[in-house]
C-alpha cells in the first residue's frame, strides 16, 4: 500500500507560471478533495497529478476521481499514468487524461504508451464559474 511506502509531504505545491497557477500532487492525494479545494482557493487553475492506479482501483475510481476533482473545483485536472506493461510485475491502469471544469474529458488515452493533448482554456473556467458559481456559494462557516 502506498501509505506504507511513502511519507506524506508537509506543504501544498502550487507553481506560479506565466500561464496560470498550477497545483501539483501525486497519486493517493486525489483521494482527498480538500487538498484540491485549497489549491483552487489559492488560485490554481490546473492540477497536474502523476498516478499509477492498479487494475483494481483504476477501472473503479480513475475516471470518477479525476472528473470529480475537476468538476468540484471548476478547474482543469490532468492525470498522467504509466502505460500498462502486461509483462511487468505491476499492472498500471494507464488512461492518462485531462478533465475540464465541466467534468468532461477533453483529452484522454487508453492503457498504451501515448501522449495526451488537450486545450486548456482559462476563459472557459470563468465561463463555467459564472454559469454555476459553486465557489461563491460555499458555506465554510457551516462546514
Residue ranges: model-predicted function:
Residues 24, 77-79, 98:
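Structural beta-sheet core signal
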Residues 54-57, 85-87:
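Short gly/pro/ser/thr-enriched loop/turn and capping motifs at secondary-structure boundaries
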Residues 51-52, 80-83:
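Short secondary-structure boundary segments
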Residues 82-143:
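C-terminal beta-strand edge segments of enzyme domains
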Residues 46, 76:
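Short, Asp-centered acidic motifs that coordinate Mg2+ and/or phosphate
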Residues 1-42, 55-64, 68, 131-134:
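Active-site catalytic loop in hydrolytic enzyme cores
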Residues 73:
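Aromatic- and carboxylate-lined catalytic core of secreted/periplasmic carbohydrate-active enzymes
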Amino acid at each position: 500500500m502506498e501509505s506504507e511506502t511513502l511519507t506524506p509531504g508537509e506543504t501544498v505545491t502550487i507553481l506560479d507560471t506565466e500561464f496560470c497557477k498550477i497545483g501539483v500532487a501525486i497519486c493517493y492525494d486525489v483521494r482527498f478533495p480538500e487538498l484540491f479545494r485549497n489549491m483552487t482557493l489559492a488560485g490554481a487553475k490546473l492540477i497536474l497529478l502523476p498516478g499509477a492506479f492498479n487494475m483494481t482501483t483504476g477501472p473503479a475510481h480513475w475516471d470518477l476521481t479525476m472528473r470529480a476533482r475537476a468538476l468540484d473545483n471548476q478547474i482543469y485536472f490532468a492525470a498522467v499514468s504509466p502505460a500498462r506493461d502486461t509483462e511487468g510485475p505491476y499492472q498500471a491502469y494507464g488512461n492518462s487524461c485531462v478533465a475540464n471544469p465541466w467534468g468532461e474529458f477533453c483529452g484522454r488515452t487508453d492503457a498504451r504508451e501515448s501522449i495526451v493533448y488537450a486545450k486548456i482554456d482559462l476563459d472557459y473556467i470563468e465561463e463555467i464559474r459564472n454559469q454555476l458559481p459553486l465557489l461563491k456559494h460555499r458555506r465554510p462557516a457551516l462546514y
